[in-house]
């Protein structure tokens, strides 16, 4: 207590009073003392922040720390999810990523244990052990110095007072002297110890700095190990992703999509084509009518994920067509490529048709292999679609307009509208001829179900079922329609578009047997084996003048002796299986065409094995129909002139269209005056009466056998039939002078057509279109009997009721474009063929039902 009191007294004197304060430390030691506090603060905060950086639990071993890491929990979650997803791409990705995260967690736990042992513990020792010990010695030195100063002050005071009281002070002074010396010794000892510790601390400062070097080295080592784990996992995950074929097809380059999927035809193209072949070939406005946005988006997503469940889209062909257009448009490079854009546009400006087709063929061969195969596949489908343009209204021109901008566009920058406006004209001029002559550009048939992944529908929707025989390879189950439905369809086509292709429709009527509900074998004479392809259909096919537009549905036109021609039913339109039902079969046709048709039932019965069905015209009790009155006001043209020497066995009154004067093409003329209309109406009625009398005579003179026309008559060609510019490849079973060559590496120009040897007869017969203009005089009624031809010469009837096609009939010439009759016609009328062959026939001549007459239309 006494020492403590003396210390406090001395401290007060030094602080408040003027007592001398002894400083035992040197300046260097004082600087070291001031630095100790800073170093301790630094070590303390570093230790605290490092603990915060740890993800594991501090102070535990490596195994327990690894289990508590967040990365370990993430890895376990990924591995559990991968087990649930099994062999999917996402499952494989999660499995690989989970393993990598687990390895990263292990490396992190090892890193934290090392940092805690090698860095954090030494820093904690500096801040909490070494520096506090030095500071404790400094305080001890301060107390010893106070004691020493106190003893020395008392000794000095006792020494001063010894002069006055000398007897009692010697012993006290000696005691104080001993205390002072002892206190001084303690101060020196403590001072030396403190100085030694301070110098040692300063000497270890470089060693303390190595802790932070070790920290960075530990972190670098951890990151290297973590990087090794990641570099091992990344290639494996990329391999899983590259091997997975189910990637979006829309917006992906064609080559990449085909390589990844291992396909020859792009999946969206094949899927959409197969769906449209099932239900869309008869859909009006296909590729023009837009689909619902939600349905289109759903179909695109289904194609992107390569799903096979596309059954629900059979009922919406417009959505399928929209998806096909969208895929072609979203390709990074168009199907016809940017590199050939300049060549395509240059070819589009070529005026000469033959050169244009040759240039197009050459440019097609320059397409890359993948683009060429897919372009060929698509063009073949579009050509098949155009075959039913009478129903779906999608002609090659319409298809080129709506689909062409999706096949080729410029690489230049700009809005979609600007690019389409700049390209559409050239694209249409390129795509349209390629679709028209698809068989010449790409010979051979195309199997649309390339991948064999699409199964035909068992019961297709009747609203979208395909009715033509040409669509039989699409896999649909055709529903046979009655003849009346087919006739109504032809009538509808007549009302909507007067440009009727007679020859095309006749060939279609003969070939497409699926259009008919019933076909009676009684009306199909057996074909002789020698010339089965050229046999004409049984029954006369003579359309009347008042039903020119209906010639597509009832047969090819043959000139009669008067202004009004007989109208017969082709075998395809005879729905009843028995001849006695011919009246009921002809009734719908008569109602549709507004003609008065009288059927002779016993005529077909007396025909023997030929089963000929003859239909004549007669007056109805109700008078002429409104259609007849409306068409009677036309300005009729005279009938074609008579041939100089009619063939034997045929009536001399029958006219031949193969005479020197060819009929002119159909042109529109103004309506005649009212007075002239009345006169012509009377003439029309008189002609009908005369025709009725002639029909009665015909019934009396009718003999069994097939009705034939003169062999000198040239083929009657429809004026609107386009000239065959590039040829189609010869079909199976088609006879010709020699097989048509395929296009060579550099094809010869298709000069109507290039490999046209197999189509020589067809090209000659199609040149018989009227091109010489002539005035239209008012025809005078001529009384010409329409007596059927006499019986065939002996030897023409075969034992089985068949007919030997020794003389080609008019119906055979009209319907069979591959007949060889044209050779004999050129021998009979060489000047006509030489004259007409040198004239250019327009590609499309439309029939004007209201203004054109029989001769002008022919």
Curated annotation (Swiss-Prot):
Cited SMART domains: BAR, RhoGAP
PROSITE patterns referenced in this protein's UniProt entry, alphabetically: BAR, RHOGAP
CDD domains the record matches: BAR_Rich1, RhoGAP_nadrin
A biological process term (GO) from this entry: regulation of actin cytoskeleton organization
Composition bias, Polar residues: 459-475, 543-552, 592-617, 757-769, 806-823
Species for this entry: Rattus norvegicus
Comment on protein domains: The BAR domain mediates the interaction with the coiled coil domain of AMOT, leading to its recruitment to tight junctions.
Protein name in UniProt: Rho GTPase-activating protein 17
């Amino acid at each position: 207590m006494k020492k403590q009191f003396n210390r406090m007294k001395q401290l007060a004197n030094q602080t408040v009073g003027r007592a001398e304060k002894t400083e035992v430390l040197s300046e260097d030691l004082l600087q070291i003392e001031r630095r100790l506090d800073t170093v301790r603060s630094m070590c303390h905060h570093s230790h605290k922040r490092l603990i915060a950086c740890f993800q594991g639990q501090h102070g535990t071993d490596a195994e327990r720390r690894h289990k508590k890491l967040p990365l370990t929990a993430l890895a376990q979650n990924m591995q559990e999810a991968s087990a649930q997803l099994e062999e999917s791409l996402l499952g494989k990705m999660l499995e690989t990523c989970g393993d990598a995260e687990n390895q990263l967690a292990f490396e992190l736990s090892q890193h934290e244990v090392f940092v805690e042992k090698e860095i954090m513990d030494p820093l904690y020792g500096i801040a909490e052990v070494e520096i506090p010990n030095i500071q404790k010695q400094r305080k001890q030195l301060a107390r010893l110095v106070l004691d020493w100063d106190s003893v020395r002050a008392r000794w000095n005071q006792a020494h001063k007072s010894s002069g006055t009281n000398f007897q009692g002070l010697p012993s006290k002074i000696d005691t104080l002297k001993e205390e002072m010396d002892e206190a001084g010794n303690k101060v020196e000892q403590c001072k030396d110890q403190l100085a030694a510790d301070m110098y040692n601390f300063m000497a270890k400062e470089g060693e303390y700095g190595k802790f932070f070097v070790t920290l960075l080295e530990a972190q670098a080592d951890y990151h290297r190990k973590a990087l090794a784990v990641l570099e091992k996992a990344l290639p494996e995950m990329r391999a899983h992703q590259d091997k997975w074929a189910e990637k979006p097809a829309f917006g992906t380059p064609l080559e990449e999509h085909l390589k990844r999927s291992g396909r020859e035809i792009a999946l969206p193209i094949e899927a959409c084509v197969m769906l449209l072949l099932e239900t869309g070939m008869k859909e009006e406005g296909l590729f023009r009518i837009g689909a619902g946005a939600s349905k289109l988006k759903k179909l695109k997503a289904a194609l992107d994920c390569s799903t096979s469940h596309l059954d629900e889209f059979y009922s919406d062909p417009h959505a399928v067509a929209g998806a096909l257009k969208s895929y072609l448009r979203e390709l990074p490079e168009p199907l016809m490529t940017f590199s050939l854009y300049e060549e395509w546009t240059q070819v589009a400006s070529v005026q000469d048709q033959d050169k244009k087709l040759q240039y197009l063929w050459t440019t097609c061969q320059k397409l890359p292999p993948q683009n060429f195969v897919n372009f060929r596949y698509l063009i073949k489908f579009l050509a098949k679609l155009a075959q039913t343009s009478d129903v779906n209204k999608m002609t090659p021109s319409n298809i080129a307009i709506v689909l062409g901008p999706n096949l080729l566009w410029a690489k230049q920058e700009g809005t979609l509208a600007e690019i389409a406006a700049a390209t559409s004209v050239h694209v249409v001029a390129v795509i349209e001829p390629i679709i028209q002559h698809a068989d010449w550009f790409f010979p051979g048939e195309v199997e649309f179900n390339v991948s064999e992944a699409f199964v035909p529908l068992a019961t297709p929707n009747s609203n979208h079922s395909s009715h033509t025989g040409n669509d039989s390879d699409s896999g649909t189950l055709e529903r046979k329609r009655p003849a009346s439905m087919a006739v109504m369809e032809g009538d509808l086509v007549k009302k909507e578009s007067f440009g009727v292709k007679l020859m095309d429709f006749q060939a279609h009527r003969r070939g497409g047997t699926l259009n008919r509900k019933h076909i009676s074998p009684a009306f199909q004479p057996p074909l002789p084996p020698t010339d089965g392809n050229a046999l004409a259909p049984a029954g006369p096919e003579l359309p009347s003048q008042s039903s020119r537009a209906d010639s597509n549905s009832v047969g090819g036109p043959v000139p009669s002796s008067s202004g009004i021609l007989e109208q017969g039913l082709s075998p395809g339109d005879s729905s009843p299986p028995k001849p006695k039902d011919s009246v009921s079969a002809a009734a719908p046709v008569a109602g549709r065409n507004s003609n008065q048709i009288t059927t002779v039932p016993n005529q077909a019965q007396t025909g023997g094995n030929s089963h000929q069905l003859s239909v004549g015209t007669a007056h109805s009790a109700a008078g002429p129909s409104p259609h007849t009155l409306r068409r009677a006001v036309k300005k009729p043209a005279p009938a074609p002139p008579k041939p100089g020497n009619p063939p034997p066995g045929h009536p001399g009154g029958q006219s031949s269209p193969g005479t020197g004067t060819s009929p002119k093409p159909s042109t529109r003329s103004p309506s005649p005056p009212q007075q002239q209309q009345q006169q012509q109406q009377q003439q029309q009625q008189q002609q009908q009466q005369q025709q009725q009398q002639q029909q009665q005579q015909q019934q009396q003179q009718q003999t069994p056998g097939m009705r034939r026309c003169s062999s000198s008559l040239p083929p009657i060609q429809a004026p609107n039939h386009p000239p065959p510019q590039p040829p189609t490849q010869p079909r199976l079973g088609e006879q010709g002078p020699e097989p048509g060559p395929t296009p060579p590496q550099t094809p010869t120009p298709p000069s109507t057509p290039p490999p046209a040897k197999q189509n020589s007869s067809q090209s000659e017969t199609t040149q018989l279109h009227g091109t010489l203009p002539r005035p239209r005089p008012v025809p005078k009624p001529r009384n010409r009997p329409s007596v059927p031809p006499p019986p065939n010469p002996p030897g023409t009837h075969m034992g089985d009721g068949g007919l030997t096609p020794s003389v080609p009939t008019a119906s055979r010439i009209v319907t069979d474009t591959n007949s060889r009759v044209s050779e004999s016609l050129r021998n009979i009328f060489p000047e006509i063929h030489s004259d007409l062959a040198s004239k250019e026939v327009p590609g499309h001549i439309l029939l004007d039902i209201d203004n054109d007459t029989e001769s002008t239309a022919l």
